[in-house]
């Protein structure tokens, strides 16, 4: 299939290079971090700083949270993939009906939800996953990253909870930054 983590990285990298952007600040949240950090580390001269928020860059030797594993399972087994209801359930406060409707708007029926439903299974884990080598190389670049890296995480996300510590401890550019940990 063409719908893989690696293809998403390649598509975004192609877009980045065609647009020839430089001097950028990368802001990555959720899957934006998994895909975008690969872009940053493959194009270090284009980026001046990084902000990561409730995201990570998976490695085979770092097991994802139990909450993420539950999300993967749920995404494949729930009969009706109600995006708006899921977004409301993942929020600290219940979302208004019109906000839930807005989240559901791109998905008139289940046939439109194939990509959203399959995305959790694209997570690159295990030593045999094709992305393991590329993600390991990306972490090697991050371990040498001296430009600013800021974390802006929430302590209430069971999937990424504590992920800010990895970036703060392992990326030199994270030292001395005004990191944010949002309650809730």
Model-derived regions, located:
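Active-site loop/oxyanion-hole signature of alpha/beta-hydrolase fold enzymes
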Residues: 1-28
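Conserved loop-alpha-helix segment in the C-terminal half of the alpha/beta-hydrolase fold
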Residues: 146-184
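Helix-rich cap/lid subdomain of alpha/beta-hydrolase
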Residues: 59-119, 123, 127-131
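Short beta-strand segments
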Residues: 25-29, 51-54, 118-120, 150-155, ...
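Generic structural signal for small/hydrophobic residues in well-ordered secondary structure
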Residues: 12, 16, 29-30, 103, ...
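Conserved hydrolase catalytic core segment
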Residues: 19-63
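Serine-hydrolase catalytic core
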Residues: 113, 137-146
């Amino acid at each position: 299939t063409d719908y893989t983590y690696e293809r998403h990285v390649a598509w975004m990298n192609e877009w980045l290079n065609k647009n020839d952007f430089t001097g950028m600040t990368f802001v990555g949240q959720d899957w934006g971090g998994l895909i975008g950090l690969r872009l940053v580390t493959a194009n270090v001269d284009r980026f001046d700083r990084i902000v990561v928020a409730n995201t990570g860059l998976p490695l085979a030797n770092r097991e994802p949270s139990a909450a993420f594993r539950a999300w993967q399972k749920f995404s494949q087994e729930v009969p009706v993939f109600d995006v708006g209801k899921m977004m409301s359930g993942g929020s600290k406060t219940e979302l208004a009906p019109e906000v839930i409707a807005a989240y559901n708007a791109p998905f008139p029926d289940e046939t439109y939800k194939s990509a959203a439903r399959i995305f959790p299974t694209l997570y690159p884990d295990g030593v045999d996953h094709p992305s393991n080598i590329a993600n390991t190389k990306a972490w090697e670049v991050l371990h040498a990253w001296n430009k600013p890296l800021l974390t802006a995480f929430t302590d209430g996300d069971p999937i990424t909870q504590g992920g800010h510590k990895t970036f703060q401890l392992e990326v030199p550019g994270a030292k001395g930054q005004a990191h944010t940990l949002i309650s809730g």
